[in-house]
Amino acid sequence: MTDTDKTKAASSMWGGRFAGGPAAIMQRINASIDFDKRLYAQDIRGSKAHCRMLVKQQILTEADGALILDGLDKVLAEIEAGNFPFSHALEDIHMNVESRLAELIGEAAGRLHTARSRNDQVATDFRLWVRDAVDGMESALKELVTALLDRAEEHAATVMPGFTHLQTAQPVTFGHHMMAYVEMISRDRSRLADARRRLNECPLGSAALAGTSFPIDREATARDLGFAGPMRNSLDGVSDRDFALEFMSASAICAVHLSRLAEELVIWTSSQFRFVTLSDAFTTGSSIMPQKRNPDAAELIRAKTGRVIGDLNALLIVMKGLPLAYSKDMQDDKEPVFEVADTMELAIAAMTGMVRDMTVNVDILRAAAGAGFTTATDIADWCVRALKMPFRRAHHVAGSLVKLAEGKNCGLEDLTLAEMQAIEPGITEEARSVLSVESSVNSRTSLGGTAPVRVREAVAGARRRLMDEAP
């Protein structure tokens, strides 16, 4: 079939009231096949479910139904073999599939669209695609959580500096730091699961907007396609893309979490920190400076977060002014969703690889944990417990000790007892026991705290939750 023939074929699907064909520029702006061909598997799956329902309801004959199902299998095989003749003249994946089906089986192909519009067809395809994307992303995030848990368990007692304002604050453990991201990514997975429950309703049978006069069985097609049930309102079924927005929103929040971890990896791998070393598999060199090991994977994850957020904003702006029901604006819903899914797939896989393969430089972390008077809060807490001092006064005492040590260019643990007692006479030699970074982290035994015993409990709890998930 020539392009001219295909243009005529496309027009024949909707052009009965037109005297002429579309302009060339109209064909270009109207065609979506370059991107929506990614929906081919979902489109064919939806068409097969629709066909089976039409046969069951005696709207199609069994003979026509068998022809259509066999023809759709052949179309699917051609696409997956790379032999399918995609055509811009046929506008979109739906018309491309239907046109090829007609070439293969003849007039029966035209009966497939009974009781169906491209409006509910594409809404169904898109929900199926997003559902698959959610499942794939959720599975990838589970692998990332597992990688983080492995490193957290390995380094439950590895001391490192904790930061606020990127200034050393209090000692924590590397395992505790990894578990913070386990919690964040676990919430990302929960958001995706929530989004999946809401998107798992079937719009097929909504037709153009008002439903159909044919005696269809929407429950049957919903079950066939694995949906929880049909959407309750036909206008809503073809009009909204909140399921796509929710997927993108959950992805954007997850991307922010990945970006924050990526930023920390960039900082931690710098020559000024050297907290971790990324494997050669996730770094690159310089074309001029032979010594360089650049954390490019982490930097690219950080950059790609902006693309995910931008795509979410783009679709929000597309949808914000659309009256019910379908508008052609909604053809532009797919590219941002596809890009978000592709970007997240790459970012999650790269982050999982970096976390699994990175070397944690334990000695450097330990040395850095004690710098910057990170146990100052511990001496204040000791004053509260041992001297029954109000915390605000204890805070002032600890601050004065820090000022003294800073002036002497030494650590808190290097101050003599006499020097400490000059600031607070009640301080005894026992106070020194709280000044080591190991003592500091071991004392943080409150629920969710950084004590190694709590970190190990948190790891075990997270692993149990993963095991308890439904398959």
UniProtKB/Swiss-Prot annotation:
GO terms for cellular component: cytosol. Its main location: cytoplasm. The keyword Amino-acid biosynthesis applies. Transmembrane segments: none annotated. Pathway: Amino-acid biosynthesis; L-arginine biosynthesis; L-arginine from L-ornithine and carbamoyl phosphate: step 3/3. One of its GO terms (molecular function) is argininosuccinate lyase activity. InterPro entries: Arg_succ_lyase_C, Argininosuccinate_lyase, Fumarase/histidase_N, Fumarate_lyase_CS, Fumarate_lyase_fam, Fumarate_lyase_N, L-Aspartase-like. It holds the Pfam family Lyase_1. It comes from the Bacteria. Gene3D superfamilies: Fumarase/aspartase (C-terminal domain), Fumarase/aspartase (Central domain), Fumarase/aspartase (N-terminal domain). It is found in: Cytoplasm. Keywords: Amino-acid biosynthesis, Arginine biosynthesis, Cytoplasm, Lyase. It catalyses: 2-(N(omega)-L-arginino)succinate = fumarate + L-arginine. Its EC number is 4.3.2.1. It is an enzyme of class 4 (lyase). GO terms for biological process: arginine biosynthetic process via ornithine; L-arginine biosynthetic process. Belongs to the lyase 1 family. Argininosuccinate lyase subfamily. HAMAP family: Arg_succ_lyase. This is Argininosuccinate lyase. It comes from Paramagnetospirillum magneticum (strain ATCC 700264 / AMB-1).
